[in-house]
Design a protein with these regions (language model features):
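Periplasmic polypeptide-binding modules associated with outer-membrane biogenesis and secretion
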Residues: 2-4, 24-233, 245, 263-271, ...
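Strand-connecting loop/turn motifs
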Residues: 121, 195, 220-222, 253-255, ...
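Transmembrane beta-barrel strands of outer-membrane/channel proteins
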Residues: 202, 227-231, 260-264, 290-294, ...
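Outer-membrane beta-barrel translocator/receptor signature
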Residues: 208-211, 222-229, 235-260, 264-277, ...
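Residues that define the transmembrane beta-barrel architecture of outer-membrane proteins
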Residues: 209, 238-242, 269-273, 311-315, ...
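Residue-level signature of outer-membrane beta-barrel architecture
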Residues: 217, 248-250, 279-281, 321-323, ...
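Transmembrane beta-strand segments of outer-membrane beta-barrel domains in Gram-negative
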Residues: 280, 285-438, 442
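C-terminal transmembrane beta-barrel domains of outer membrane proteins
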Residues: 400-562
C-alpha cells in the first residue's frame, strides 16, 4: 500500500487512542471500543466554537486521516480466550480484500463484539488499538470483561451455609471472562433454594478489564402455608373440598424443603394426605426427592347400597436437573419411580380387589419467554412412563383376561405431552392456547387413564366424565384484564379419546368427543387471596357422570396463602 495511506491511518488510530486514554487513564488497551460499553470520550470537552468560525476552520488532521483507506489483507485478534477465534475470523471475513477506512475497522470491532454477546459475554469490548498497519494486517484487541473478586454477604438469619453459596457460584471463576449465561444460571440456582433471597451486583474492579461480583443472601419466611376451598369433587365422592398445605423451607439449612398436604371432601367421602421431602445434591441444580401419600374414599349416591370404599398408598422417588437455567429459557430433565398399592371393596357383597402399579417415568419440561408478536410465554412438557399392573386377586385377574376382559394385566407404556402458549395481542388483550395428549401401548387400568372432563380439561363436564387410554385435550382462552386484580376470559374447550386402546370384538364404538364453552374470572388481591371461577355450557351430549347433566357447570376455587 502507499506509505502515505499507511502513515495517515497510523495517525488516525493513534489520535483515537489518545482520546480514549484521556477518558480511561490506566486502561491497558487504547483505541476505539465496541461492545456493550460506549466509546471512550475525552474527560474534558473543549468549548463549542461559533458556527461561522467553525466553517472557516480547516479540517482536523484526525478527520482527514480517518478517511484514508487501504486494502485489508488480514485481521489478528489479541486477548481472546472466551470464544473460538475461528468465529471472530468468520465475522470479519467479508471485509478481507476490500478497501477499508478507520470507520470500517470500527465496524469490524463491533462485529467481533457481537460474537462475544452471542456467547453470553455481555461485558466484552473489542478495540482498534494504537498500531501501524503493515501489509494490510490489522490487529483488534479484546477486553473480555474478566471476573475479579467475588464477595459473599450472608444475612445472620439466612438458612444456608456460606459454603453452599460459594460452591453454587463456583461456575463463575475469577480471572476468566464473566459469561452472562453462567452468571444467570448461578444466581437462579441460588434463588431456587427455599428460604433465601439472593441479590447480586457487578462493578468495575481495580485491575484493568476485571469486574467484581457482590452477592447478598437474605432470608425469607421459613414456614409457608395455605388453604384452598373448591368444588372440584363429584356428588358421589364429595363435591366441595378443603385442602391445606405447609412448607418448611430449608429445615436442615441446605436448601431443602419438607412439604405436607392434606385434603378432605364434603362428608369425608374422600380424604388425601401426602408428605414429601426434597434436597439439593451437589451444587449444579440436581435435586432428589421422595414422598408418601394415602387416599381413602367412600362413594355415595347411586353406589351407596354396595358400600364401595377404597384405599390407595403411593410411594415415589424423583429427581430434577436444570439442563438450561436462564431468565428467558429453562429446560429441566425429570424422572420418577413410583409404587401404587390400591384396594377397592364392595362391602355389601363382600368383594375386594387388590392391585399394584409400579413404574419409571422420564420427562422434559421446557419454558421460554420471548418478544415475538409483542411478547409471550411458551411451555412444553413430555413424559414417557413404563409401568406394570399386577392384579393381586384371582377373581379380578380372571375377568381381566381377553376376550371378555380388557387385558390390562402386565407391562404398559404411555406417553404424555402438554403444550401451552400465552400470547400478547393488545395492551389489554391476550390469547392462551393449550393442548394435552396421551398415547398408550395397551389397555390401561382406570388409575392410568386420561380424564376428558373437569376444571383442567373440558370445563362443561365433571371430572372423570370420560376416561380414555388414548386422547387429546385442547383449550383456547381470550383474556382481558379489567384492572390489576381481575381478569375476565372467554374460553372454548375440546377433547376426544378412545376409552380403550384396543376394544373387544363385540364392543360398540368406544370413542367420544366433548366440547364446551364459557366465561371465567380470575381475581386476586393483596394478602395472597386468589379466586378462580368458570361457567361452562356443553357443546356436545349430556354428561353421564356426577348425577347426569348440569348446564351450565360451575367450577370455582378460593386460595389463601399465609
Amino acid at each position: 500500500m502507499p506509505s502515505i495511506n499507511r502513515n495517515l491511518l497510523a495517525v488516525a488510530v493513534a489520535l483515537t487512542g489518545m482520546a480514549a486514554a484521556q477518558a480511561r487513564a490506566g486502561d491497558a488497551l487504547l483505541g476505539t471500543p465496541a461492545g456493550d460499553g460506549s466509546a471512550a470520550t475525552p474527560a474534558t470537552a473543549p468549548a463549542a466554537a461559533d458556527p461561522q468560525q467553525a466553517q472557516s476552520l480547516p479540517e482536523p488532521p484526525v478527520a482527514a486521516a480517518a478517511q484514508a483507506s487501504f486494502v485489508l489483507r488480514a485481521v489478528e485478534f489479541s486477548g481472546v480466550s472466551g470464544v473460538p477465534e475461528a468465529e471472530l475470523q468468520s465475522a470479519v471475513a467479508g471485509w478481507i480484500g476490500k478497501s477499508v477506512t478507520l470507520a470500517d475497522l470500527e465496524q469490524l470491532a463491533a462485529r467481533a463484539a457481537a460474537v462475544y454477546r452471542r456467547h453470553g459475554f455481555a461485558l466484552a469490548q473489542v478495540f482498534v488499538p494504537v498500531q501501524e498497519v503493515v501489509d494490510g494486517r490489522v490487529r483488534l484487541s479484546v477486553v473480555e470483561g474478566r471476573l475479579g473478586a467475588v464477595d459473599i454477604e450472608l444475612a445472620p438469619d439466612a438458612p444456608i451455609t456460606r459454603e453452599r453459596v460459594a460452591r453454587t457460584l463456583a461456575i463463575l471463576e475469577p480471572g476468566k471472562p464473566l459469561n452472562n449465561h453462567d452468571y444467570e444460571r448461578a444466581m437462579l440456582l441460588l434463588s431456587d433454594l427455599p428460604g433465601i433471597r439472593p441479590q447480586s451486583a457487578v462493578s468495575f474492579g481495580g485491575a484493568s478489564g476485571n469486574n467484581d461480583l457482590s452477592v447478598r443472601v437474605g432470608a425469607q419466611a421459613r414456614l409457608k402455608y395455605g388453604l384452598e376451598l373448591d368444588d372440584y369433587g363429584t356428588r358421589d365422592s364429595g363435591r366441595v373440598r378443603l385442602t391445606g398445605s405447609l412448607r418448611w423451607a430449608s429445615p436442615f439449612e441446605r436448601g431443602d424443603n419438607l412439604d405436607l398436604r392434606v385434603m378432605a371432601a364434603q362428608g369425608m367421602h374422600t380424604a388425601f394426605g401426602r408428605i414429601s421431602y426434597e434436597s439439593p445434591v451437589g451444587y449444579s441444580g440436581l435435586r432428589l426427592g421422595g414422598g408418601l401419600a394415602r387416599v381413602q374414599y367412600e362413594l355415595g349416591g347411586p353406589f351407596a347400597p354396595l358400600k364401595p370404599t377404597g384405599v390407595g398408598n403411593v410411594a415415589d422417588l424423583s429427581f430434577s436437573y436444570p439442563l438450561i437455567r436462564q431468565r428467558t429459557t429453562n429446560l429441566f430433565l425429570r424422572g420418577v419411580v413410583d409404587d401404587k398399592r390400591l384396594t377397592d371393596r364392595f362391602e355389601a357383597v363382600g368383594f375386594t380387589t387388590r392391585k399394584r402399579i409400579h413404574g419409571v417415568g422420564l420427562g422434559l419440561a421446557f419454558e421460554r419467554r420471548d418478544r415475538w408478536g409483542g411478547g409471550g410465554y411458551t411451555s412444553l412438557n413430555a413424559q414417557l412412563y413404563r409401568g406394570r399392573l399386577d392384579i393381586r386377586d384371582a377373581f379380578s385377574r380372571f375377568f381381566d383376561q381377553p376376550p371378555f376382559g380388557y387385558g390390562t394385566q402386565g407391562g404398559f407404556t404411555k406417553l404424555t405431552l402438554q403444550a401451552a402458549r400465552l400470547q400478547y395481542l393488545a395492551p389489554k388483550l391476550s390469547l392462551f392456547l393449550g393442548a394435552g395428549l396421551q398415547r398408550a401401548s395397551k389397555n390401561l387400568d382406570a388409575y392410568e387413564k386420561l380424564s376428558l372432563g373437569g376444571p383442567k380439561a373440558v370445563r362443561a363436564y365433571a371430572i372423570g366424565e370420560v376416561l380414555v387410554d388414548d386422547g387429546w385435550i385442547a383449550t383456547a382462552e381470550l383474556r382481558h384484564p379489567l384492572n390489576a386484580q381481575a381478569t375476565l376470559f372467554a374460553f372454548y374447550d375440546a377433547a376426544h379419546g378412545d376409552q380403550f386402546h384396543r376394544s373387544r370384538p363385540f364392543d360398540p364404538d368406544l370413542s367420544r368427543s366433548l366440547r364446551g364453552y364459557g366465561l371465567g374470572l380470575n381475581w386476586s388481591k393483596p394478602g395472597n387471596v386468589t379466586v378462580n371461577l368458570s361457567v361452562a355450557w356443553r357443546g356436545t351430549g349430556p354428561g353421564l357422570t356426577d348425577g347426569g347433566d348440569r348446564k351450565p357447570r360451575v367450577f370455582w376455587t378460593i386460595q389463601k396463602a399465609f
